[in-house]
């Protein structure tokens, strides 16, 4: 072995031996002076305390603090001077390990380099008056010059906490922070310029992080694990926590913070960021009052969240909360439905207007560039804004372009069923939020629908190639550019509703929709479904009513005022031209006003009403008929239910006034025997053609007269209609065949009883008489037949002599 190696080994051996001798001496010294050392340590630790620190016993543990001297203090308690009043011990530790500087110890002084607290409870208490048991620690008087004769306070370089319960209980500020610290290790560096820098490694269970105990705790029962770098500046009193990754539960967070201890109530700002957290996991970290609201929603994929908490440790309410969330291509579940392909940037604050405090009333949510798809309908909202979470109000601009058939996914097919066509929507809205759903939205903007096929299911009415433009203003609704096509019918419409949205939500019965309707051609048979019974009934509106139910109720209860102009109207055999009408549609029926049409060379005007009762429709009509071709008139209305007298038997021009009521079926047919009322008529240039009841009698009585073409110069009369029976008021018939006085009852079943007084003289003999009085006097000259038309045994009308006539007439 080389000589230098031997020398080196000897030196090392001497040093080791010297160290062992020193430690043996120290051990002997500590054991010999245990009580005095315990007293010295206690005095040192009590030096700057407003209270008492007591130590039960002390045991040396040299190897743990090598090369320093370690001492284990058992049953350590620390109580402030007012402990008897509040009964909250600041520190109660079963074991406290202290490592002291060896050289200082040999000099007779104590310099603490490390302290460890095991199996302990730390309770920082502040009562309702603001007094805290941390008052045990005396504040340094910065104005007082340091006395060289005074020894400095002990500096702690390292510390550890194991199995420590740490509580901050602030009764005045309604705050409760409670942690079960499994393991905490820290290294502290004290720069020459003052302050300190610390590196910490933490593993703790958060039992409570309640900034307002009346609201509940954040991150309750969550495990926190991770490192911290903390610095403190003596001059500013600011504690700075550098951003580091801290695991809260199973989610990593980047957390940084700042605490300003120079203020009477320490102010704090905590910055939190997580790049990949599920919505429900994030909501579970918040206070229960916030969690309950957020859990009404859900996002399927993780999101990126930034959060800043700010406040102070003094009395007061909640901390300020500012949250920013980034959502992309996610699935959003809401109480109102599911939004697919959802992307947006969201912001939340509980102090929206500066100076108005922190509260739900001053809270706001903003959603920027919101895009998604609801029930396969894509839409976007540039900026959605919700403020005042106590009575939340949502505003925004809703935009969407979609195939209109997709509306069936939202409103169902019970009322409106959509086929092809497109919709373009741009609406600014303002709505209350009740139970996390938009309620009573007020909208402003446009809805355009083009080339759409729509079926109105309750009435079985179908429209093709429909167009409509809805313009919502602040108060009113304007409906423009409407094109409806049902079969051969094409209708162009424009409408308006005053005070629409207000009445829609509060009193739909008062809604009055004004329509201007124009059409080149309408086939009424294609709209016959409006006479039928509606399949679904309108339900009483509730908070849970869906859009379809509310719209259905609107259609049922609102009033519609129509001004109609139609070039041609077809119904079965009926054709009218130049039609004009004013209709008022209400929940109870239809009021018909100022109706005028051209028909069969003349005109028809009418007023009346239609009331629906189940599967039938009761109508009342007052009509004025002027110069209408009676043949076409009877043909158009299927001879008004008569089988004996038809359009083939009639000729002439009809002038008439009627006051009639009746019943139409849901198929649009006049129900037999349902007509009641009166008909006054004047038939000019009339003729009765091949009318069998006349021919059957006339071929025997008047074999040489023309029975196939019986002409009338003027025929006036009045009929009273009572269902199956028509009362023929006494009337005179002056024809080319014969003259006749007629009166009685014509029945469409049984009960016909018509008296006929027929002079047999040929009316042509009086054709050249111009004097009306003379013609009237000669009218009944000669032989007069008194006949009675009544029911025969075979059910047909039979003509016989009227032997029981009133002979005084």
Placement of each model-derived feature along the sequence:
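N-terminal Sec-pathway targeting helices
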Residues: 2-18
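Membrane-proximal interfacial segments on either side of biological membranes
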Residues: 44, 51, 64-66, 105, ...
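A short alpha->loop->secondary-structure connector
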Residues: 128-135
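Generic long, charged, amphipathic alpha-helical segments
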Residues: 712-719
């Amino acid at each position: 072995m080389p000589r230098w190696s031997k020398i080196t080994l000897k030196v090392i051996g001497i040093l080791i031996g010297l160290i062992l001798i020193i430690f043996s001496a120290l051990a002997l010294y500590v054991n010999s002076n245990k009580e005095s050392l315990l007293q010295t340590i206690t005095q040192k630790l009590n030096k700057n305390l407003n209270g008492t620190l007591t130590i039960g016993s002390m045991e040396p543990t040299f190897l743990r603090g090598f090369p320093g001297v370690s001492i284990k203090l058992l049953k350590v308690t620390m109580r402030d001077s007012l402990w008897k009043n509040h009964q909250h011990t600041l520190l109660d530790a079963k074991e406290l390990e202290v490592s002291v500087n060896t050289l200082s110890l040999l000099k007779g002084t104590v310099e603490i380099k490390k302290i460890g607290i095991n199996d302990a409870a730390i309770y920082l208490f502040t009562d309702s008056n603001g007094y805290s048991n941390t008052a045990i620690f005396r504040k340094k008087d910065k104005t007082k010059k340091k006395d060289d004769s005074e020894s400095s306070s002990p500096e702690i370089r390292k510390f550890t906490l194991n199995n420590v319960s740490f509580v901050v209980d602030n009764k005045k500020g309604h705050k409760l922070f409670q942690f079960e610290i499994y393991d905490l290790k820290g290294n502290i560096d004290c720069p020459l310029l003052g302050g300190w820098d610390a590196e910490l490694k933490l593993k703790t269970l958060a039992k409570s992080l309640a900034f307002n105990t009346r609201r509940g705790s954040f991150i309750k029962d969550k495990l926190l694990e991770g490192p911290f770098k903390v610095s403190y500046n003596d001059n500013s009193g600011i504690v700075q926590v550098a951003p580091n990754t801290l695991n809260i539960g199973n989610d990593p967070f980047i957390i940084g913070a700042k605490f300003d201890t120079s203020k009477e109530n320490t102010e704090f700002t905590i910055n939190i960021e997580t790049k990949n957290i599920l919505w429900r996991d994030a909501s579970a970290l918040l206070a229960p009052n916030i969690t309950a609201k957020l859990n009404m929603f859900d996002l399927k994929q993780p999101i990126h969240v930034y959060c800043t908490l700010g406040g102070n440790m003094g009395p007061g309410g909640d901390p300020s909360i500012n949250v920013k969330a980034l959502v992309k291509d996610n699935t959003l579940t809401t109480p109102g439905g599911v939004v697919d392909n959802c992307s947006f940037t969201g912001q939340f604050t509980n102090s929206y207007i500066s100076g108005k405090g922190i509260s739900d009333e001053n809270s706001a949510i903003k959603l920027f560039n919101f895009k998604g798809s609801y029930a396969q309908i894509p839409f976007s909202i540039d900026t959605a804004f919700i403020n005042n979470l106590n009575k939340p109000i949502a505003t925004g601009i809703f935009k969407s372009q979609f195939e209109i058939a997709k509306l069936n996914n939202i409103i169902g097919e019970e009322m409106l069923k959509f086929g092809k066509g497109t919709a373009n929507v741009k609406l600014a809205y303002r709505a209350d939020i009740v139970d996390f759903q938009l309620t009573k939205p007020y909208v402003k903007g446009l809805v355009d629908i083009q080339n759409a096929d729509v079926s109105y299911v309750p009435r079985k009415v179908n429209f093709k190639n429909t167009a409509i433009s809805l313009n919502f203003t602040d108060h009113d609704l304007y409906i423009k550019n409407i094109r409806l096509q049902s079969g051969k019918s094409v209708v162009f419409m424009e409408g308006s509703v005053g005070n629409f949205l207000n009445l829609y939500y509060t009193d739909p019965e008062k809604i009055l929709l004004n329509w201007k309707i124009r059409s080149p051609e309408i086939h009424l048979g294609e709209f016959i479904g409006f006479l039928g019974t509606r399949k679904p009934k309108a339900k009483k509106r509730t908070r849970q009513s869906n859009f379809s139910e509310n719209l259905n109720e609107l259609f049922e209860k609102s009033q519609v005022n129509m001004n109609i102009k139609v070039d041609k109207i077809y119904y079965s055999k009926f054709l009218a031209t130049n039609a004009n009408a004013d209709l008022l549609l209400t929940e109870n029926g239809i009021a018909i006003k100022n109706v005028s049409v051209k028909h069969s060379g003349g005109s028809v005007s009418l007023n009346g009403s239609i009331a629906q009762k189940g599967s039938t429709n009761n109508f009342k009509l007052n009509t004025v008929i002027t110069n209408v071709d009676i043949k076409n008139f009877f043909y158009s209305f299927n001879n008004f239910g008569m089988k004996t007298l038809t359009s083939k038997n009639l000729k002439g021009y009809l002038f008439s006034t009627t006051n009639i009521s009746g019943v139409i079926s849901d198929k649009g047919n006049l129900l037999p025997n349902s007509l009641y009322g009166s008909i006054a008529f004047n038939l000019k240039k009339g003729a009765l053609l091949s009318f069998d009841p006349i021919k059957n009698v006339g071929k025997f009585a008047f074999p040489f007269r023309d029975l196939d073409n019986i002409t009338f110069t003027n025929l006036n009369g009045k009929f009273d209609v009572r269902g199956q029976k028509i009362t023929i008021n006494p009337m005179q018939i002056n024809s080319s065949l014969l003259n006749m006085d007629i009166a009685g009852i014509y029945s469409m079943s049984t009960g016909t009883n018509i008296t006929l007084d027929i002079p047999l003289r040929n009316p042509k003999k009086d054709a050249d008489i111009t004097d009306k009085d003379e013609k009237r006097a000669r009218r009944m000259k000669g032989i007069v037949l008194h006949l009675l038309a009544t029911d025969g045994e075979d059910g047909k009308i039979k003509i016989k002599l009227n032997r029981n006539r009133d002979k005084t007439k």
